[in-house]
Regions:
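Charged, low-complexity intrinsically disordered terminal segments
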Residues: 1-224
Length: 224
């Protein structure tokens, strides 16, 4: 079937130069959790933690949700005390279109801040769903992994680790656009707003769902 397609579309294929739309890289590595059903070893989480902790100068982490257990909080502590400048950006609770993610961020904020991680909350027009990391000037990581218990222990997930200065520069530029729509949450819970962002506010519907989950369903946070 493939050969027939190529033969039938020879003129289209011949006129396309993949090199014009691609970038040479030094190396690409695929990170994956196991594919079995049920609980899994946190392979991706362990690898991402190691990569971030070993950053020489900087690391930027973007994730839609932060839902951690004690092991994951300890990993954030390791990141926070590394020599590199590390930031973690996620949706603010009112801006999060996942009610479990919103409820958990509010409830666990003291625990997140206690790790010492430099936390930023995104308040753009729509909820942010980027799952990406840039490290130093050459490593870019992107894929399906959320920084939550489900991605860490239940779902398979995939992340690409790309060694390329050009890809890193592109990713950093894209990520910075979102960071400029976020506010910095300080260790005491107060906020700094260097980009004069208009912070998202709860709609009545989102606030009601968030409150219901906090009161009745917080025990199920690892399944969402």
């Amino acid at each position: 079937a493939y050969n027939n397609y190529i033969s039938d579309n020879d003129s289209k294929m011949a006129s396309y130069d993949y090199k014009e739309d691609t970038i040479p890289v030094n190396k690409i590595t695929i990170l994956s959790n196991a594919t079995n059903c049920g609980m899994k070893d946190p392979v991706i989480w362990a690898n991402l933690t190691e990569l971030v902790v070993n950053a020489r100068e900087r690391a930027k982490i973007h994730t839609p949700y932060i839902i951690c257990n004690d092991v994951m909080y300890r990993s954030l502590e390791e990141m926070a005390v590394s020599d590199a400048d590390i930031i973690l950006m996620t949706n603010s609770a009112p801006n999060n279109d996942n009610p479990v993610g919103a409820a958990e961020l509010e409830s666990s904020m003291p625990d997140i801040l206690a790790t010492g991680i430099d936390l930023w909350e995104f308040s753009g027009e729509k909820a942010y769903h980027g799952k990406s990391i840039v490290i130093d000037d050459n490593i870019s990581i992107i894929g399906s992994f959320n920084m939550d218990i489900r991605s860490t222990y239940l779902d398979t997930e995939l992340m690409l680790v790309i060694d390329s200065e050009e890809i890193n520069a592109q990713m950093s530029s894209y990520m910075e656009k979102y960071e400029k729509q976020s506010v910095n949450i300080l260790s005491d819970g107060t906020k700094e707003n260097p980009y004069n962002v208009t912070e998202a506010e709860y709609t009545s519907k989102r606030k009601a769902r968030k409150t219901l989950i906090q009161k009745l369903f917080s025990w199920a946070r690892c399944f969402f």
